């Protein structure tokens, strides 16, 4: 950690089989953090070995969901100020310098939390593209006032939420410099993540009593491809952006398809009514239904 920082920062990263990316993530935070904690979900690759070799404190924790893992990580951070990045992210050198300047000048407590711009980096790129899409997320915050644990009814939508008794008006500052979010290591990895994440989302939605219409399921991919490729500007990545947008749209479709499946399993009595609205062409003569077609 830089000796210029007057208040110390705890950085944490949650991982599962991130041997290919964890070094980049840790190296981008270790110069501004007093401690780097890796909460690992029983990786079977060299994630733990690499993290420990870089000086990180590794705690193995069976998977609790995205919110659960990050909430647990907060509890073992010794400092009030917490910096969270994911294993597929990296703080730019400029952002590291900006954070160091704020803390070295003792101005960090003017705000309760800081938002970071996460520039999307395609896995084949070495630097950000012009007009690359980005997301703004609260990733640097004082845990006395905010926490991932305040997220309600979700194990997947991991966001820092302020305590109910905290007035956070004008207390969040968006940092000028950016971090980089890498889109994935391969198409195979993106598809595997889409399959896993959509299942977790479906479980969250069924707990909330959600049930999608068949029309919504049928049109979900069309809308989300349009949103990813055009509105979120994945077109800047060329044909690679087209491929990733298709995978993203498919993930959104899977989320609703799995939700429908769970809904039918939870309430079998609705199945006969649901079948009446499905887009299945029936033969005029009754025949045994092929469930693989449904």
Curated annotation (Swiss-Prot):
EC number of the protein: 2.4.-.-
Segments forming a coiled coil: none
Alphabetic keyword roster: Glycosyltransferase, Transferase
GO molecular function: glycosyltransferase activity
Family: Belongs to the glycosyltransferase 2 family. WaaE/KdtX subfamily.
Annotated PANTHER family: GLYCOSYLTRANSFERASE, POLY-BETA-1,6-N-ACETYL-D-GLUCOSAMINE SYNTHASE
Protein name according to UniProt: Uncharacterized glycosyltransferase RBE_0523
Species, as recorded: Rickettsia bellii (strain RML369-C)
Lineage: Bacteria, Pseudomonadati, Pseudomonadota, Alphaproteobacteria, Rickettsiales
């Amino acid at each position: 950690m830089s000796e210029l920082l007057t208040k110390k920062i705890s950085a944490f990263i949650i991982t599962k089989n991130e041997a290919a990316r964890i070094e980049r993530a840790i190296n981008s935070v270790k110069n501004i953090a007093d401690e780097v904690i890796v909460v690992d979900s029983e990786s079977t690759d060299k994630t733990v070995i690499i993290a420990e070799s870089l000086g990180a404190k590794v705690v193995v924790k069976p998977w609790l969901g995205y919110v659960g893992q990050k909430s647990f990580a907060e509890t073992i951070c010794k400092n009030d100020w917490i910096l969270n990045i994911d294993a597929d992210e990296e703080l730019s050198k400029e952002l590291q310098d900006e954070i160091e300047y704020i803390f070295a000048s003792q101005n960090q407590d003017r705000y309760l939390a800081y938002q970071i711009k996460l520039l999307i980096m395609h896995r084949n790129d070495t630097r950000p593209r012009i007009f690359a899409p980005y997301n703004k997320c609260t990733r640097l915050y004082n845990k006395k006032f905010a926490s991932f644990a305040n997220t309600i009814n979700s194990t997947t939508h991991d966001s820092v939420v302020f305590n109910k008794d905290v007035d956070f008006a004008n207390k969040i500052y968006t940092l000028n410099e950016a971090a980089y979010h890498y889109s994935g290591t391969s198409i195979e990895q993106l598809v595997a993540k889409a399959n896993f994440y959509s299942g977790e989302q479906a479980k969250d939605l069924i707990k909330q009593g959600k049930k999608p219409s068949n029309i919504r399921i049928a049109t979900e991919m069309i809308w989300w491809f349009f949103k990813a490729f055009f509105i979120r500007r994945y077109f800047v990545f060329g044909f690679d952006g087209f491929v990733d947008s298709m995978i993203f749209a498919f993930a959104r479709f899977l989320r609703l398809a799995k939700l429908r499946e769970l809904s039918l399993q939870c309430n079998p009595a609705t199945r006969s009514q649901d079948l009446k609205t499905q887009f299945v062409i029936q033969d005029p003569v009754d025949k045994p239904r092929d469930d693989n077609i449904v």
